Amino acid sequence: MQGPLLLPGLCFLLSLFGAVTQKTKTSCAKCPPNASCVNNTHCTCNHGYTSGSGQKLFTFPLETCNDINECTPPYSVYCGFNAVCYNVEGSFYCQCVPGYRLHSGNEQFSNSNENTCQDTTSSKTTEGRKELQKIVDKFESLLTNQTLWRTEGRQEISSTATTILRDVESKVLETALKDPEQKVLKIQNDSVAIETQAITDNCSEERKTFNLNVQMNSMDIRCSDIIQGDTQGPSAIAFISYSSLGNIINATFFEEMDKKDQVYLNSQVVSAAIGPKRNVSLSKSVTLTFQHVKMTPSTKKVFCVYWKSTGQGSQWSRDGCFLIHVNKSHTMCNCSHLSSFAVLMALTSQEEDPVLTVITYVGLSVSLLCLLLAALTFLLCKAIRNTSTSLHLQLSLCLFLAHLLFLVGIDRTEPKVLCSIIAGALHYLYLAAFTWMLLEGVHLFLTARNLTVVNYSSINRLMKWIMFPVGYGVPAVTVAISAASWPHLYGTADRCWLHLDQGFMWSFLGPVCAIFSANLVLFILVFWILKRKLSSLNSEVSTIQNTRMLAFKATAQLFILGCTWCLGLLQVGPAAQVMAYLFTIINSLQGFFIFLVYCLLSQQVQKQYQKWFREIVKSKSESETYTLSSKMGPDSKPSEGDVFPGQVKRKY
């Protein structure tokens, strides 16, 4: 009973908020905390704060003003060398790292222009900086040696780049561990920038996470992953950025390079390494934030990649890295390992086939109509109500809701929260539809197997007991686990569907492949059982017409049970375009086959349709008779030539 009350209640709340908003248009005496009144009509958040809705001027009474963290992307205030940014409520400040202080003696400053941080430690620190300076100068000469890179082949270039990356990491970590008392070291030139941080004791509550910044790129890593449980000696983390290396190991080294896409590298190449233990597993993924080399729209394809070394050379790979957030200036990635990283972007993505789009929308529209008619038939036709029609009804409802949401919501990528909800709902509805297809296959097999013993009652009891918990419960558990584990992978930049990152698509494809494989096996078993049964009957029973009808219904069951979805996995190679058309045409008409087989070709349903048709005609005839009688009046008598509906004029 709560469902009918929900919509009026929601409308009431919206109207209440609208009335409150209208009243506040003439006065903003009650702006939220950290906000000020503008022209006595609107509120605006104070400097250092932003509204929850993103609007500069607002009147909504429940709006909030949240603190802006200027030290993180997309703001990322740059404090200069040997300094870090600290966020405070409504503001921020820069401060020299330990071992450095301002020339003026002040504790804080506002930006890199005010940075006069000077070294105050012993000569060992100077030696450490000198060592780092030698490293960056040495490798700068290698990176800028155009003759070296032009004379080498593709495989030699990747191998040389891999060697350089490993050597820089090793030498930088070695330098940082020589003098761990110098907590932070920063150095850079035109080609390489380095920051190292050393840990000499256990992780504290204040330093659970370390943040390193070089050339507007940053990395967040857990302290426990740096020390790896080793409390006997110092540990260090190094973060290195290469300004020009991306021109050498560019997007042509991407292992998933598609000739149809113009992919380019849109960030500096960065490396991350920890020591003294090198090849270690991380308890939690590191977060990397890249500043774009070119400001680009956030709707482009974005790939978080790392430099993967193999026996045949090295290349950019997405394994273990996935996208968290992207805007015009920055990209944020999560990676489950340490290596060298970058951001690749697709300048132009593959255009959609307009013919396939038309086929999809027309086919799904026809399916929606057929599924609606089928669902109404199963609901209203009392003569055919049983376990079988209950299965048909649930399958029809799930497919109807899934197709309807697909048509109206698949492209609604903004706001992102709504897009994620749509993606999650589509995930659940299509999984539920496939689960009901599996139950259809199981019921069909059990019915065929028990033809000889006529044990329908036990089948019905079994299906009634398991079908609803399985049909709706199993998909709910699958989606709940997926959403709890990877909520950010619901919704992409151009579709409200599942991300391809981290193999997340297999949370849908895995169950689907298992279901249509099981249904294909069940279909073959049913076909074999029916063939044996029919061959044992009197030859007169199996007429040519009945055989043809049986063959047609059996073929249609392939579509209804979802076995044709395997065509979606065959869209590779030269036949990809043909398979795409077959997959789209066949599966967009699944609803039509359900209505055709379970309704139009069912004798019981045909009789019910005929009964309904006669009742409609009779009702219409009686209505016309009543209307005509009303026009003639109670005292009127029909003339000899008048013939009422349903009467035949007799000749004597």
From Swiss-Prot:
Keywords: Calcium, Cell membrane, Disulfide bond, EGF-like domain, G-protein coupled receptor, Glycoprotein, Membrane, Receptor, Repeat, Secreted, Signal, Transducer, Transmembrane, Transmembrane helix. Residues 24-66, 67-118 form the EGF-like domain. Displays a predominantly leukocyte-restricted expression, with highest levels in neutrophils, monocytes and macrophages. Residues 304-351 are annotated as: GPS. The keyword Transmembrane helix applies. Belongs to the G-protein coupled receptor 2 family. Adhesion G-protein coupled receptor (ADGR) subfamily. Orphan receptor that may play a role myeloid-myeloid interactions during immune and inflammatory responses. A ligand for the soluble form of this receptor is present at the surface of monocytes-derived macrophages and activated neutrophils. PANTHER family: ADHESION G PROTEIN-COUPLED RECEPTOR E3 (PTHR12011:SF455), ADHESION G-PROTEIN COUPLED RECEPTOR (PTHR12011). This is Adhesion G protein-coupled receptor E3. It comes from Homo sapiens (Human). The lineage of its organism: Eukaryota, Metazoa, Chordata, Craniata, Vertebrata. The gene is ADGRE3.
